[in-house]
Amino acid sequence: MNSEWSLDILYKGFDDPKFSEDLTSFEKKAKELDELSKTLSHENEKKDLLQIVKVLEEFELLEKHLSCFGSLSQSTNTANAKAAAAIDKVATIASTASKAMAVFSRYIADMKDLNSYLDCPELCEYKYFLNDIHESGKYLLSEDVEEALAKMNISAGSAWEKQQSLLTSSLEVEYDGKKLPLASVRNLAYDVDKEVRKAAYEAELKSYAPIADAVSFSLNNIKLQVITEAKMRGYTSPMDMTLHQSHVSQKTLDALLSAMQKYLPVFHKYLKRKAEMLGYENGLPWYELFAPIGKSATTSFTPETTKEYLVNHFRPFSDDLADMMEEAFDNNWIDFYPHKGKVGGAFCCNMPFVKQSRVLTNFDGGLGDVVTLAHELGHAYHGLNIESHRPLNWEYSMPVAETASTFNENIIMNAVIDETEDKEVKLGLIENQLQDLCQIICD
């Protein structure tokens, strides 16, 4: 089992002839979209709609192949110049199709009898997708403005995002006489030694000083772009735009936030009690948020034992899920360990066009890392279930995306707690759950 993922199923590298061929095909497909956008007529709506869907599917497949390879390559090495160049090239080509995309969206939004075309086999699976475009027409800008926004994003919000990622992923932290990646130092927040937790926290904060202004500048400009675009499109706020794009109503969000606010006093009580158990009288220091309580589970996991643990616990629930987990470990879907230049945190990238996913994590061998992998493999399972969908139906909103992953977390944590007989270890496990919930609700 390799500790690094393989991207060979996409391309062998940026010098792979197939990468160049697909890049050329992608550019041609963008031009084809532009040409198609100039031939539309409401006298031939069904015929036009069929052609739009066909070309968009082909465009989507090429873009996914190319962009996934670029972004995944860069996520494990943010200094990879070839990856950065490829990402910019793909984004630039995609932006040339933005005007055509706006024309298609406006054309669909103006259709009077859209649903009458959606019974045919080629379009029936896209009923939701096409109706969503139809209903979102009021937020469209002119074709020229849509094109300008897409092109400017490459050197605006997208560029600021890349800068923030590069600065934090390449940051080295001076700790205990050594230089460590930021992700490794942040993992020390879970150490059993209070002095280690405090020293790591202070070292982390100190390391931010040289990049603090640049990161703040990046984040502020990302948000400014969102605020500006939301206003231009006619949304009442960035939140209104996000809710619309996520297919969540304000009423639903208000209900969720209301429930969270109702239970905040319970979390405050938990944090005060944790502070007392750790010997603090005036509340819990920030660097102690992840301090272990009770007895830590002594098991230290490797990728091999993590695979066995997850597969054994998910097999009784779902053979499909367990089989997919085995494939992920055996076929190099996962990039495990932190190192300089690798982005922090964890994520899953679905690649339904090759019937696989890729998972990045900063594995340190603790139970929390096992839970993180269960979470990310939940996203991969979601990817497994969209493989049979047509390309334009592969996208889904965040509320949907987090369903399988959060479910997986609960499955694994509940199983671990039930299997533990030592009360102090059980306390530690329950506290781990409370930590996670506290981050979601309070942070």
Report the location of each language-model feature:
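Conserved helix-loop functional segments at active or binding sites
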Residues: 312, 316-323, 349, 379-390, ...
